UniProtKB/Swiss-Prot annotation:
One of its GO terms (biological process) is mismatch repair. Belongs to the DNA mismatch repair MutL/HexB family. Disulfide bonds: none annotated. Keywords: DNA damage, DNA repair. GO terms for molecular function: ATP binding; ATP hydrolysis activity; ATP-dependent DNA damage sensor activity; mismatched DNA binding. It comes from the Bacteria. It comes from Mesorhizobium japonicum (strain LMG 29417 / CECT 9101 / MAFF 303099). Pfam families: DNA_mis_repair, HATPase_c_3, MutL_C. CDD domains: HATPase_MutL-MLH-PMS-like (cd16926), MutL_Trans_MutL (cd03482). InterPro entries: DNA_mismatch_repair_CS (IPR014762), DNA_mismatch_repair_MutL (IPR020667), DNA_mismatch_S5_2-like (IPR013507), HATPase_C_sf (IPR036890), MutL/Mlh/PMS (IPR002099), MutL/Mlh/Pms-like (IPR038973), MutL_C (IPR014790), MutL_C_dimsub (IPR042120). This is DNA mismatch repair protein MutL. GO terms for cellular component: mismatch repair complex. This protein is involved in the repair of mismatches in DNA. It is required for dam-dependent methyl-directed DNA mismatch repair. May act as a 'molecular matchmaker', a protein that promotes the formation of a stable complex between two or more DNA-binding proteins in an ATP-dependent manner without itself being part of a final effector complex. The gene is mutL.
Length: 627
C-alpha cells in the first residue's frame, strides 16, 4: 500500500483513541474547558453511563459565533500562544472537541456576555454541520450523544453503566477539589446526584470542599501540610495513620491546580507513611503542588494525567519530608472513628464496627503477636516484671529474616524503654495525671488493655500495640543515629549493570556505606559489593543492588535500603514488645502512657491500628441518658 495522507476524520479518530478512553474522559475534557472559560457553575448530566448522553453546561465567558467553527477544528485554541513551557490553563492542545466530535454526535451552544443571541454548531462522526442561531443564557452547553457510534469496536471495551457512572463521578470530584469556589452538580440516569456548593479559595473554604467530597470525618482525622523548598510549595491535608484505607483511590494530587495521577507523588506518599502503615493500607491525602510551570512538563501524555518534573528528587524529598514532619508534629493523635465505632456498638441493635484498620482486623494481628517470638509473658512465671527491657545488638540480628538479639547486649542499645525519668513518682498526684493527654491509669483488663482517666474522657490503650510502637521508634532512632553495622562478604559480589546505573551507584557510595552497604566500581559496567548490612542477614545482593539502581534512576534516593532496614526493626519491635497477657503494675502502666505522650506517632502501631481509643465523658453520659 503506498504512503498517503490520512483524512482529517481518521486523524481525529486516532487522536480520540488517545484522549477519549471512556465517557469519564469526555467529562474531564469538557469540565476543564468550562473552568478555563472562568465558570463559577458547572452542571453535568449523563445517561447510559455517559454513552447515550453527556451534557456539560457552564456560565463561563462563552464562545463568539465567528469562533465556533475554529473551536471544533484540530489544534485551534485560545489558551496557548507561543511558549509551551508556560502553560497555566487545564487545556492547551486544541484536540478534545474535534476528537470527541469524530466518534460521537456533538453539539456546542454558546453565548458571550456581549452577544445578542446564542449560536450552535454540531459534528456527527467527524462531519461538521453549519452554524445556526440558538437560544441560551451566557455560557456554553456541550452535548455529546451516542459516544463511539462511529467507532463501534471501542464499545466492546466499555464496562457496565454503573462502573462508567462511578468513573465519571470520580472525575468530577477530583476536579472539584481543586476549584472550591465553583459550584458543581452531576446528575445521572440512575437518579444519582452529586451536589457540591461553592465555598471560597481560602484554606478553610478548600477544606470545606474536601469534606464535601471525602466526607465530614476526614478534616477531623487529617493533618494540615504546608511546606516550601526551592520555589516548590506543597499544601494540603493527609490522614493520620489510623484513618487509612484498603486502596489508594482517595489519594488526590494536584500540580498547579491540575489533577494528576503521578507515580512519583504516589511513591513519595507511600514512602512517607512507610513507618506507620503496612503495605496493604493507604493514607487518605489531598496534596497541592504549586511551582513554576517552566520546571514541570504537563505535555507528557495526551490525557494530561501524567507530568514530569525537572527535579524529581526535590519534589519527592519535599513531599516525604513535609508529611513525616506533620506526622511527628501531630504527636499521638488517633482516629476519631474508633471512638465513634465503639459508641455505635453500645447502641441496641448496632452492627459490629470496623474503624478502618487493616482488612483482617484486630484478631489476625492478635493471633500473630501471641504466636510470634517467645510465646508471650506468663504472669505466673514472671510476676510483675518491670518494663525496663533493653533491645539491641543489631550485629547479632543476622538470621535469615533478621534475628532478634538477647536483652542487654548493647551494640545498638536503646536504653530502657521506660526510663527512670518517665516513671511516676510518689509525689506525682492523680490530679496532675488527669490533666495529661492519656490521663492516669486506673486498671488493666484482659491483661492487654489499660484503662485510663482524664478530666473529661476515658482512654483505653492496647498495651502491646503501644509498646510495639515505642520499641520500634527507639530501635529506628538508634539505627539511624550512627553508621549501620555491616558484615564483610567472604568473596565480593560482582554485579554487571548498565554503565549509567553503575555510575549512579558509585556517586551514592558514601550514603550507601552509612547504611552498611560497601560498594565500589569494578571496571566498565560493573560494581563490587564487599559489605552488606548485618541486619539483612542472608539477602539477595544482586536484587538489592538492582533495586537501588532503579530507585536512584527514578528518584535520586536510596530509600529502598533504608525501608528494608526499617522493616526489620519493625519486626524486631513486634517480637520485643510487651505481650498480651502481661500483668502490669500501676506505675508501669502510667510510665507507658507518659512515654506514649513523649513519642511522635505513638497513636498508631506498626500495622496501622490505633494504639488507643478515647471516649469523651459527654458521649458516655449520653449512652446512659444523662444528656
Amino acid at each position: 500500500m503506498p504512503i498517503r495522507q490520512l483524512s482529517e476524520t481518521m486523524i481525529n479518530q486516532i487522536a480520540a483513541g488517545e484522549v477519549i478512553e471512556r465517557p469519564a474522559s469526555v467529562v474531564k475534557e469538557l469540565v476543564e474547558n468550562a473552568l478555563d472559560a472562568g465558570a463559577s457553575r458547572v452542571e453535568v448530566v449523563t445517561a447510559g453511563g455517559g454513552l447515550n448522553l453527556i451534557r456539560v453546561t457552564d456560565d463561563g465567558s462563552g464562545i463568539p459565533e465567528p469562533e465556533l467553527a475554529l473551536a471544533i477544528a484540530r489544534h485551534c485554541t485560545s489558551k496557548l500562544a507561543e511558549d509551551i513551557n508556560d502553560i497555566r490553563s487545564l487545556g492547551f492542545r486544541g484536540e478534545a472537541l474535534p476528537s470527541i466530535g469524530s466518534v460521537s454526535r456533538l453539539s456546542i451552544r454558546s453565548r458571550t456576555a456581549l452577544g445578542d443571541s446564542a449560536a450552535e454548531i454540531g459534528i456527527e462522526g467527524g462531519r461538521v454541520l453549519p452554524v445556526r442561531p440558538a437560544a441560551a443564557n451566557r455560557g456554553t452547553t456541550v452535548e455529546v450523544r451516542d459516544l463511539f457510534f462511529a467507532t463501534p469496536a471501542r464499545l466492546k471495551f466499555m464496562k457496565g453503566e454503573r462502573a462508567e457512572s462511578s468513573a465519571t463521578s470520580d472525575v468530577v470530584k477530583r476536579i472539584a477539589i481543586a476549584f472550591p469556589a465553583v459550584r458543581f452538580t452531576l446528575a445521572g440516569s440512575d437518579r444519582s446526584t452529586l451536589e457540591l456548593p461553592a465555598t471560597d479559595d481560602s484554606p478553610e473554604g478548600s477544606l470545606r470542599r474536601v469534606a464535601q467530597v471525602m466526607g465530614a470525618e476526614f478534616p477531623d482525622n487529617s493533618i494540615a501540610i504546608d511546606a516550601m523548598r526551592e520555589g516548590v510549595h506543597l499544601t494540603g491535608h493527609v490522614s493520620i495513620p489510623s484513618f487509612s484505607r484498603a486502596n489508594a483511590l482517595q489519594q488526590y494530587a494536584y500540580v498547579n491546580g491540575r489533577p494528576v495521577r503521578d507515580k512519583l507523588i504516589a511513591g513519595a506518599i507511600r514512602g512517607a507513611f512507610a513507618d506507620v502503615l503496612p503495605r496493604d493500607r493507604h493514607a487518605v491525602t489531598v496534596l497541592f503542588l504549586t511551582l513554576d510551570p517552566a520546571i514541570v512538563d504537563v505535555n507528557v501524555h495526551p490525557a494530561k494525567a501524567d507530568v514530569r518534573f525537572r527535579d524529581p528528587g526535590l519534589v519527592r524529598g519535599l513531599i516525604v519530608g513535609a508529611i513525616r514532619q506533620a506526622l511527628a508534629d501531630a504527636g499521638i493523635r488517633s482516629a476519631t472513628t474508633g471512638a465513634a465505632g465503639m459508641m455505635a456498638a453500645f447502641r441496641p441493635g448496632a452492627a459490629s464496627y470496623n474503624h478502618g484498620g487493616p482488612a483482617n482486623g484486630h484478631r489476625s494481628y492478635e493471633a500473630a503477636y501471641r504466636a510470634s517470638g517467645s510465646a508471650g509473658f506468663d504472669p505466673a512465671r514472671s510476676p510483675q516484671r518491670p518494663l525496663d527491657m533493653q533491645f539491641g545488638d543489631f550485629e547479632r540480628a543476622g538470621a535469615r529474616h533478621g534475628g532478634f538479639s538477647e536483652p542487654g547486649q548493647a551494640a545498638f542499645d536503646t536504653g530502657p524503654l521506660v526510663s527512670a525519668d518517665a516513671r511516676v513518682g510518689q509525689n506525682e498526684t492523680t490530679e496532675t495525671l488527669l490533666g495529661t493527654v492519656l490521663g492516669a491509669a486506673r486498671a488493666q483488663v484482659h491483661e492487654n488493655y489499660i484503662v485510663a482517666q482524664t478530666r473529661d474522657s476515658l482512654v483505653i490503650v492496647d498495651q502491646h500495640a503501644a509498646h510495639e510502637r515505642l520499641v520500634y521508634e527507639a530501635l529506628k532512632n538508634a539505627l539511624h543515629s550512627r553508621p549501620v553495622p555491616s558484615q564483610m562478604l567472604l568473596l565480593p559480589e560482582i554485579i554487571d549493570l548498565p554503565e549509567e546505573d553503575a555510575e549512579r551507584l558509585a556517586m551514592h557510595s558514601e550514603t550507601l556505606a552509612r547504611f552498611g552497604l560497601g560498594i565500589e566500581r569494578f571496571g566498565p559496567g560493573a560494581v563490587a559489593v564487599r559489605e552488606t548490612p548485618s541486619m539483612l542477614g542472608e539477602t539477595n545482593v544482586q536484587q538489592l543492588v538492582r533495586d537501588l539502581a532503579d530507585e536512584i534512576a527514578d528518584n535520586d534516593t536510596v530509600e529502598t535500603l533504608k525501608e528494608r532496614l526499617d522493616k526489620i526493626a519493625a519486626t524486631m519491635a513486634c517480637h520485643g514488645s510487651v505481650r498480651s497477657g502481661r500483668l502490669l503494675k500501676a506505675e508501669e502502666m502510667n510510665a507507658l502512657l507518659r512515654q506514649m505522650e513523649a513519642t511522635p506517632g505513638s497513636g498508631t502501631c506498626n500495622h496501622g491500628r490505633p494504639t488507643y481509643i478515647e471516649l469523651k465523658l459527654a458521649d458516655i453520659e449520653r449512652l446512659f441518658g444523662r444528656r
